[in-house]
Amino acid sequence: MQLDLYVDKINNGFNSNILDILAFISIILGIYTIVSKNPVVSVLFLIGLFSTISIYLIMIGLTFIGLSYLLVYIGAVSILFLFILMLINIRISELVSTNNNYIPLAILSMITLVYILGQKIITNVVQFNILNSFTSSLFEKSFKESINYSNSLSWDTNLIDITHTSAIGNIMYSSYSFWLIIISLILLLAMVGSIVISIGRVI
């Protein structure tokens, strides 16, 4: 019973089969991102991969990180890559001969990453039941209270307390507002520069 409650807390009440389907879809999209010969199509698969990962993170309760994936990776980085690739004239024939050479390296990197994660990440949730033997311990009480407090302090449901999102926003738009404007100008110059380069080549 305790194991079921723990698993339900991990997946935020959603069906674990849906999470498995999202994980499988993300793996397929990641493979197509590497294998695709067209860079524009590869970026589109990358956007789909980030979208699936963000949905997965939101469903397990990590809403801030999931929305950060949507805003940063999809809304800024991937769209900027797609914008630049559509402006630059890339010959597909130049990529066909060298694209397949990266597949063994990608497979080796994926196997290495899975091995490292398998050694470091705890896969057996029964090990957490060791806390049941310390029913009268002060450590168990404080540990449970800290877990419940961190789970209840969700930035999208509790708008009264100052959360990480509001703290970052207050610091970014008050103390570091000048640097935020500088970064925005640099991004604007990068976009205008890519347009000028592409127009110069056409002329």
Curated annotation (Swiss-Prot):
Belongs to the complex I subunit 6 family. GO terms for cellular component: mitochondrial membrane. Its EC number is 7.1.1.2. It is an enzyme of class 7 (translocase). It catalyses: a ubiquinone + NADH + 5 H(+)(in) = a ubiquinol + NAD(+) + 4 H(+)(out). Core subunit of the mitochondrial membrane respiratory chain NADH dehydrogenase (Complex I) that is believed to belong to the minimal assembly required for catalysis. Complex I functions in the transfer of electrons from NADH to the respiratory chain. The immediate electron acceptor for the enzyme is believed to be ubiquinone. It is found in: Mitochondrion membrane. Keywords: Electron transport, Membrane, Mitochondrion, NAD, Respiratory chain, Translocase, Transmembrane, Transmembrane helix, Transport, Ubiquinone. The chain crosses the membrane at residues 16-36, 40-60, 70-90, 102-122, 179-199. It is a multi-pass membrane protein. It holds the Pfam family Oxidored_q3. This is NADH-ubiquinone oxidoreductase chain 6. It comes from the Eukaryota. GO terms for molecular function: NADH dehydrogenase (ubiquinone) activity.
